[in-house]
């Protein structure tokens, strides 16, 4: 009797599981795909003032991230990575997008209107279907793409995208945050250009990472020496938006000769309305990594605080000006002009 009762309960449980599965997939794949498309479009369109978009089309999380490793000076030219670009975008229900870009003062102030579409295959895809400022990055040099795959939101609620351009992880960075005022569409890009140009105008930028009196890293090499043999390197820094902060491990006893041994930390950069953002970041080690700097007078500064990551259920370090409520760590970084 107990045996039959057990079989009956097992059958009932199986039927319940089947009914549960049916309720999970109560809509067709076509309907679910359309719902995902509609949800992303509604989200993009519903931001009344538009979006601030940071796009690093090609990054390398391993390039110049080992401050104890010697750097052959023959590799300084031609070995730099690539930085990012700042856009503002406003999407409308009729599939139009108004865009500004940080390429120049003109593109920062002159809006360009193009068309976008949203489709669904394996991912929900945002496509910029007619020519826009973004397409200036869609080439072999920058390896950009006009088709963005929606990956969800980060712990701060920003929209995160990737492209099919790169198969390996951490090779690009696309982040969208809603603007907070009607003036943001114009002012954010203009300010990002101003901050980037201020950094690029530094004659001898140096980086210091410290915690109280303990210095983890401090660059001291004059990378941007204004000599004819340095012209190609100076052009590469500006064109690629990448900077390498160099520390001299062993100086040359012969005056005015290149040092015998150097090391450094490098990253691509982009100007923001608050200062600078570096990706893949100025990464001293797995823990001490600086991404977002705020401009303070003639310096760029960052202070790391600890916050709880609700997605990963662990703590992470972020810049204090983005999370003033975070726990103070005392880890700071400054970029200044040692001219």
Give residue spans per PLM region.
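Bacterial N-terminal signal peptides that target proteins for export
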Residues: 1-6
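C-terminal motif of bacterial Sec signal peptides marking the signal peptidase cleavage site
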Residues: 14-17
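N-terminal glycine/threonine-rich, aromatic-flanked beta-hairpin/loop signature
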Residues: 68-123, 215-280
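A cross-kingdom feature marking solvent-exposed beta-strand/loop segments within repeated
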Residues: 129-146, 289
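Elongated scaffolding segments in large macromolecular assemblies
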Residues: 184-240
């Amino acid at each position: 009797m107990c045996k039959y009762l057990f079989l009956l309960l097992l059958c009932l449980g199986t039927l319940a599981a089947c009914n549960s599965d049916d309720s999970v997939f109560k809509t067709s794949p076509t309907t679910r795909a359309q719902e995902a498309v509609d949800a992303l479009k509604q989200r993009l369109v519903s931001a009344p003032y538009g979006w601030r978009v940071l796009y690093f089309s090609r990054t390398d999380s391993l390039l110049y991230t080992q401050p104890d490793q010697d750097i052959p000076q023959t590799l300084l030219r031609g070995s730099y990575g690539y930085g990012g670009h700042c856009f503002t975008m406003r999407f409308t229900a009729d599939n139009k997008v108004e865009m500004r870009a940080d390429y120049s003062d003109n593109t920062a102030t002159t809006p360009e209107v193009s068309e976008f579409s949203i489709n669904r295959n394996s991912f929900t895809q945002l496509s910029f279907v007619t020519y826009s400022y973004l397409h200036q990055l869609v080439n072999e040099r920058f390896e950009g793409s006009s088709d963005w795959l929606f990956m969800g939101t980060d712990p701060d609620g920003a929209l995160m995208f990737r492209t099919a351009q790169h198969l390996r992880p951490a090779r690009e960075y696309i982040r969208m945050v809603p603007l907070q005022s009607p003036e943001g569409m114009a002012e954010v890009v203009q300010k990002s250009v101003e901050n980037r140009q201020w950094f690029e105008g530094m004659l001898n930028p140096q980086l210091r990472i410290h915690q109280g009196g303990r210095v983890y890293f401090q660059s001291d090499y004059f990378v941007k020496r204004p000599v004819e043999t340095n012209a190609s390197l100076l052009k590469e820094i500006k064109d690629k938006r990448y900077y390498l902060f160099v520390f001299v491990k062993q100086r040359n006893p012969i005056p005015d000769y290149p040092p015998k041994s150097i090391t450094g930390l490098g990253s691509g950069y982009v100007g923001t309305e608050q200062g600078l953002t570096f990706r893949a970041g100025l990464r001293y080690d797995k823990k001490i990594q600086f991404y977002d700097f705020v401009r303070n007078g003639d310096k760029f500064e960052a202070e790391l605080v600890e916050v709880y990551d609700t997605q990963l259920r662990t703590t992470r370090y972020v810049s204090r000006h983005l999370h003033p409520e975070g726990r103070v760590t005392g880890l700071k970084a400054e970029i200044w002009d040692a001219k």
